Amino acid sequence: KWHARSGKLLGTGQTVRYRSDKVIENRDRESSYAVYDPASRTWTPWDTLEMPDPVKFQSAGAGSVQRLDLPDGDILLPIYFKSKEQKTYRTTVVRCSFDGTKLAYREHGNELTIDDGRGLYEPSLTRLGDRYLLTLRNDSAGYVAVSRDGLNFDKPIRWLWDDGTDLGNYNTQQHWVTHSQGLFLVYTRKGANNDHVFRHRAPLFIARVDPQT
């Protein structure tokens, strides 16, 4: 994603460790990044975001997320994390500085989870007016949470249609399309003649979000 303040392309993601061609269970995980300089047309070697508590954030990464860049150049980077002993993920938004070269931790907001499956993970963030919205993956359903400052969020609620029925998304990330004509959610769901597709991950759907409800 283009970082306007620095004039650099900042790619963010997470590390994944393998052994014998398989992902290592209960592995260390970090948010990773690399920077592209359009003047030299080169990428930097990838680096990782240093977090304040290596035990608490033993498995912490910005995998499959959408971040938000602020006018002052700071970055709101959603991550999900757990310690080695925990079974469920928590989601938080990390405020980072970025000087065009190094991504550095400043602070993080409240920590969101639910007692269902692996918790809340693969978060994506957007802003609409004076509110920030965070969409979250869970094993059973998609969730959304709202904030006034981009760091501290209300209790997550399940994604619902305007008639109160469940969206039908589960165990798959969702993403935002923030447009001048409104806010939209890109998602997958069951119940669309797609039972033959793994976790109903095709086709992709897009729906307008009512930010008031």
Residue ranges and their predicted role:
Residues 1-60, 68-122, 126-168, 180-182, ...:
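Beta-rich carbohydrate-recognition and catalytic domains
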Residues 170-174:
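Alpha-helical scaffolding within the catalytic cores
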